[in-house]
A protein has these predicted regions:
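N-terminal export leaders
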Residues: 6-11
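Bacterial N-terminal signal peptides
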Residues: 13-22
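Bacterial Sec-dependent signal peptides at the C-terminal "C-region" and cleavage site
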Residues: 22-29
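Extracytosolic secretory-pathway proteins
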Residues: 29-216
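Short acidic, low-complexity intrinsically disordered linear motifs used
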Residues: 212-228
C-alpha cells in the first residue's frame, strides 16, 4: 500500500471518532506554515501503561501545501523520527482514554538515498536508522503531548507542543518555539500497519502563529463526542 493510499484510509478510519478533541482555532492568516507527515508508532511495553515508551517513524507526505521551507521532494526523502515519548498518566473511562506523555524528542531529516523502510518488528537494522540518516533539518523537544483514544473505535486524536532546539533549518525560522502537533491515529487493519507497530499516525506540525490557541475540551466533552 502506498503512503498516499494509506493516508486516505487513515483519514476515513478516523472519521468522527477523532473529531476535534483538541481543536486548533481557525485563522485568516495567509502565512500559516506547517508540515504534514504520516507513519507508524511502536512501543517498548503494553499500550496505555505508565512507563511505556512510544517511538514514531514517519515520512513527509508528498503534498505539502505551505511548507516551512522550500522542500526538495523530488530529490530527497524527508523523514520524521519521534523518540522517548514516555506515558506519564492514563485517565480511562470505559473505552475512552486520555494518555499524557513526558519527555520526547522529534527530528526531521532529509536524505537523497530515499531508503526509509517500516521493516516489521522494530527496533531493528532499518528502524530507526533509515529514518535518521541524511542531514538533520530540525531537532526538537516536546513540552507536552496528549493522546485521546477510543479502544472501541480504534481511533484517536493527538495534540502537543514542540520547541525546536537544533538542526540546519532552525536558524531560518521566525519562531522555533511552541509549535503545535495535531492529528489522528488509528489501529485499523486496512491501514497496512506492519507487524510489530502499534498505531498509524497522521499528524501535522504548525508554526506558533497559527493555529492558536489550542482548545482542549473537558473529559466529559471528549466522551460525549465519541458517543454521538
Amino acid at each position: 500500500m502506498t503512503l498516499p493510499d494509506r493516508r486516505r484510509n487513515l483519514l476515513s478510519a478516523i472519521g468522527f471518532a477523532s473529531v476535534l478533541l483538541a481543536v486548533p482555532a481557525r485563522s485568516t492568516s495567509a502565512e500559516m506554515k506547517f508540515f504534514d507527515f504520516s507513519g507508524y508508532s511502536y512501543l517498548s511495553g503494553p499500550p496505555a501503561r505508565v512507563g511505556t515508551v512510544t517511538t514514531v517513524a514517519a515520512k513527509f507526505n508528498t503534498i505539502q501545501p505551505n511548507p516551512v521551507w522550500s522542500l526538495e521532494l523530488l530529490d530527497k526523502e524527508y523523514t520524521v523520527m519521534i523518540r522517548d515519548l514516555t506515558i506519564a498518566s492514563v485517565d480511562a473511562s470505559g473505552s475512552f482514554q486520555v494518555i499524557t506523555y513526558s519527555g520526547g524528542t522529534v527530528e526531521v531529516h532529509a536524505d537523497p538515498a530515499k531508503n526509509a523502510s517500516w521493516t516489521p518488528n522494530p527496533p531493528n537494522n532499518a528502524v530507526p536508522s533509515t529514518f535518521l540518516d541524511g542531514g538533520a533539518d530540525l531537532i526538537g523537544v516536546f513540552t507536552e503531548m496528549t493522546l485521546y483514544f477510543s479502544t472501541d473505535s480504534g481511533t484517536g486524536t493527538l495534540s502537543g507542543l514542540v520547541n525546536w532546539e537544533g538542526g540546519s533549518r532552525r536558524a531560518g525560522m521566525a519562531n522555533p518555539f511552541g509549535w503545535t502537533v495535531f492529528g489522528g491515529v488509528s489501529n485499523h487493519d486496512g491501514l497496512g500497519i506492519p507487524i510489530g507497530y502499534d498505531l498509524a499516525w497522521d499528524p501535522q506540525m504548525y508554526g506558533p502563529e497559527v493555529p492558536s490557541p489550542v482548545e482542549i475540551r473537558s473529559w466529559g466533552a471528549v466522551k460525549r463526542a465519541f458517543r454521538r
